[in-house]
Every structure is written in structure tokens, then in C-alpha cells.
Amino acid sequence: MNRQLRRVALAAAVLIPVSLLAAAPSASAANDGTTSLATVLKAGQAKFDQNDKDFDILTKAVEAVLANKPNSPVKVLADGNTALTAFIPTDRAFKNLASALSNKTVKTEAGAFKVVAGLGIDTVESVLLYHVVPGATILSGDALKANGAKLKTALDGKVIRVRVTNAPAIILGDYAPKLANPRVNLDQVDINKGNKQVAHGINAVLLPIAP
């Protein structure tokens, strides 16, 4: 298996079953803010840069989907009244994906976005939706207690399987079984904490289908 292709699966998410969330009303009460993730990610203002750890490519992908499909379910990211948890790949994650898809090293954010956009707007939309778990504001502390959880995403009932180790590490199972399991970026959790919509940075793009 191509090493770059294996890196495509190194994604991560901070997850907890909805049933566990129901058992923790105090946590829910602390997340009543309505600032949307689109606001936090500065949708409409993102610019490509040299920072591999931020989310410019993701934001541009969201913008592209909504420009072409204004009624896409992706628009929920701009509705701060709707609770959800999003797992947002860094720019480095998208560069790795673009490199694997094009069989050459993609060094710039603009170049990576071009490769990803070339997959077609419907594919980009599906990939984005696979990174969203609707209906729950999931914080990292809860995620570390969620070993064995299966979370239904916004993509056609597709799920993400969660395994938590003692390291600690949060490892995910997606739909690319031959690739290395994804992991969470523990230094990029609880983005937009205090609001109904939270995000956690991940180090690769989650795959809803096998490559």
C-alpha cells in the first residue's frame, strides 16, 4: 500500500454516544451559545497561507459546496442554533490527501484545494458531511470515555467507530479498512467550546468509502 495513501486515513475525531450525552445534562447546559462553526472558521474570509495546522482548505471546500448547492445539508455549519460536532481536517491533512490522489507531492494549499475540488462538488459535499455528527455537542473529556461508540454522521447514516486507548488516544474506524486507523489531534480539541457547535481538529481526511 502506498505510504501517502495510508496517511490519508490518519484522521481523528472526538466522539461520544448520544446516550451518554443524555446522561450529562450539566455538560449540555454549558454549551448554549449560538456562535456557528462557519463564523469561527471565517467562512467567506479564508485565505490560503503557509500554516499547515489551520483549516483554510476545509473552509474553502464548505464555501464551494454552498456556492454550488445553496440548500446543501452542509449549510448546517452556519446555523449556530443546531447542535453538532464537526471533525475538521487541517490543511496538512488535505495536502496529504491531494498528494495521494495525484501521485505527486502537493506543497501548497491552493494546489491541494484544486485537487480536492477536482473530485466534483457532490463528492466534496459527501466527504464534508461525513465529518459532521449532528445533534450532539461533544467535548473532549466525554470523548475519552466513549470507547466502543458508533456515531451516525450526517452522510446517509454512515458511522464512525470509536476506540480509546490508555495513551491516551482516540482512534477511529471509517470505511477504508486497509488503511491505518485515524487518530485525534489532542492539541486541537473543543474549538468553539461553550456553543452548541464544536469542532475538533484532525490530522487527515476521514474516508466514507474505500479509496
Q: Would you name each region that the model predicts?
A:
Residues N2-P211:
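Mature, structured domains of secreted/extracytosolic soluble proteins
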